[in-house]
UniProtKB/Swiss-Prot annotation:
Stated name of the protein: Probable periplasmic serine endoprotease DegP-like
Functional description taken from the UniProt entry: Might be efficient in the degradation of transiently denatured and unfolded proteins which accumulate in the periplasm following stress conditions.
Cellular component, GO, one term: outer membrane-bounded periplasmic space
Gene: degP1
Domain of life the protein comes from: Bacteria
Active site: H140, D170, S244
Family as reported in the entry's similarity comment: Belongs to the peptidase S1C family.
Organism: Rhizobium meliloti (strain 1021) (Ensifer meliloti)
């Protein structure tokens, strides 16, 4: 009977798997994760809520001369055709002088002209980071304000003053001067933050007062186009207007991010919010408390990403680094000899991933310090040492190229670069060649080249004619390259474009 049962069991295995039992048992099992119990956030909320505040911002509206000189003396405006003995004329002659005297007295009480009353300007959130009253919020919450009020979670209202603000990271620090010791929170080590971690957002959405929402970290390192230092955490906790400047906590009650922006077609929460990481906020906040401003390192070069095509055209094995489009005149980069077409591949020995990575790391360097910059130039690696400058407060991108000739159809001197889908003509200023026409079905058309733009160099060699372009391309073919790197100047600025080159 035991033997019969064993055979039956084996038959069942063969029927369900189609394979012998010993083979079936050797397959790896599907991934199984022990599901944790859904946590309660109540303990975290109880601990951190006293440190989170609402921030009310007011601005003193300037009163114009017309407003401060308001008068009841209509001077007969609108009543010019009334007879002299008309009752309305008599009314204004008797009434207006008395009212003007009253208006003058109110102006005297208000003080000098130009100082209007305080008007509500913005409302957001913030949180204490020291027991003596320093608190963090967003720059865009306080930037237009002249008076600031902090509202505690128990309803207490306290005046605050602006310590410093930084528009590039959208952070600001306020200070409440009070004898009490405030409950405060600390920043987390956000290197330990993982996608999928639970987080709790606390703030003041729509001015409702302290509100708690929960979610997870959806992504890290988000670039939302707000500036060169974008490195946001994306969270799906409900964040709305008024949450700006409020904290996002981990389950240990540490601040992992500062709520700054939401993605929303309608203006309401759709589960996509962005928070400044704690590591970025901590450095900026420390500088604002110490100096009232933030000093950043500056290289002074305009850069763009290294695409796979660009990497291939330059002989780079990987599409990493930052391609230098234009060093700014007098900048540390220009003084150190960094040129158009160089690729910054490492900074102080650490590889550079992309332009955003380079911008953040340079900004974090102390002005006046020495940095080692590794470049890829003319097919080989070079290193330059330079002194990091101080980012000017009004630093802008280099001015766009100007003076391009705008060709007409059939312009004399046009030469065809048929394999590229281009015709070009020598530029009027002798610098490069101007694109006269672009085949919309060509690689050049696909990559956005346009009539009137200028080809300044090919593979970092200056060109002044179609023959120059062809010469550089032929040399690239001899070197086994399948792409050539074109430097393009347009009204919007300078950029590099890699175009395929036909072998043969």
């Amino acid at each position: 009977m035991l033997k019969t049962t064993t055979v039956a069991g084996l038959a069942a295995v063969l029927l369900t798997t189609g394979l012998p039992a010993e083979v079936a048992q050797s397959f790896a099992e599907a991934v199984r994760v022990q599901a944790p119990a859904v946590p309660s956030f109540a303990n975290v909320v109880d601990a951190v809520s006293p440190a989170v505040v609402s921030v009310r911002v007011q601005a003193r509206e300037r009163v114009s001369d017309d407003e401060s000189n308001f008068t009841f003396d209509f001077g007969g405006r609108g009543f010019e055709d009334l007879p002299e003995d008309h009752p309305l004329r008599r009314f204004f002659r008797e009434f207006a002088p008395r009212e003007n005297d009253r208006a003058d007295r109110w102006r005297d009480r208000r003080g000098p002209r130009g100082e209007g009353r305080l008007r509500p300007r913005a409302q957001g959130s913030g949180f204490f980071i020291t027991e003596d009253g320093y608190l963090v919020t967003n720059n865009h919450v306080v930037s237009d304000g002249s008076a600031f009020t902090v509202i505690m979670n128990d309803g207490t209202e306290l005046d605050a003053k602006l310590v410093g603000k930084d528009s590039r990271t959208d952070l600001a620090v306020l200070k409440v001067d009070d004898k009490r010791k405030f409950t405060y929170v600390s920043f987390a080590d956000d290197e330990k933050v993982r996608v999928g971690d639970w987080v709790v957002a606390v703030g003041n959405p729509f001015g409702l007062g302290g509100t708690v929402t929960a979610g997870i970290i959806s992504a890290r390192g988000r670039d939302i186009g707000s500036g060169p230092y974008d490195d946001y955490l994306q969270v799906d906790a409900a964040v709305n207007r008024g949450n700006s400047g409020g904290p996002t906590f981990n389950l240990s009650g540490e601040v992992v991010g500062i709520n700054t922006a939401i993605f929303s077609p309608s203006g309401g929460n759709v589960g996509i919010a962005f928070a400044i990481p704690a590591s970025v906020a901590k450095d900026v906040v420390d500088s604002l408390i110490k100096d009232g401003t933030v000093s950043r390192g500056w290289l002074g070069v305009q850069i763009q990403p290294v695409t796979k095509d660009i990497a291939e055209s330059l002989g780079l094995s990987e599409a990493n680094g930052a391609l230098v489009v234009e060093p700014q005149a007098g900048s540390p980069g220009e003084k150190a000899g960094i040129k158009n077409g160089d690729v910054v591949t490492a900074l102080n020995g650490e590889p550079v991933k992309d332009p955003r990575d380079l911008a953040r790391r340079v900004a974090a360097l102390r002005p006046g310090s020495t940095a080692e910059v590794t470049l890829w130039r003319s097919g080989k690696s070079e290193t330059v040492n330079l002194e990091i400058g101080t980012l000017p407060s009004d630093a802008k991108e280099p001015a766009p190229a100007t003076g391009e000739a705008q060709p007409d159809e059939g312009q004399a001197g046009e030469e065809a670069l048929a394999d590229l889908g281009l015709t070009v003509t020598p530029s009027e200023d002798g610098k490069g060649v101007t694109i006269a026409s672009v085949d919309p079905d060509s690689d050049a058309g696909d990559r956005g080249l346009k009539e009137g733009e200028k080809i300044v160099s090919v593979n970092n060699q200056e060109v002044k004619s179609a023959d120059d372009v062809l010469k550089v391309i032929n040399n690239a073919k001899k070197d086994g390259r399948s792409k050539a790197l074109f430097q393009i100047e347009a009204q919007e600025g300078s950029r590099f474009v890699a175009l395929p080159i036909t072998q043969g």
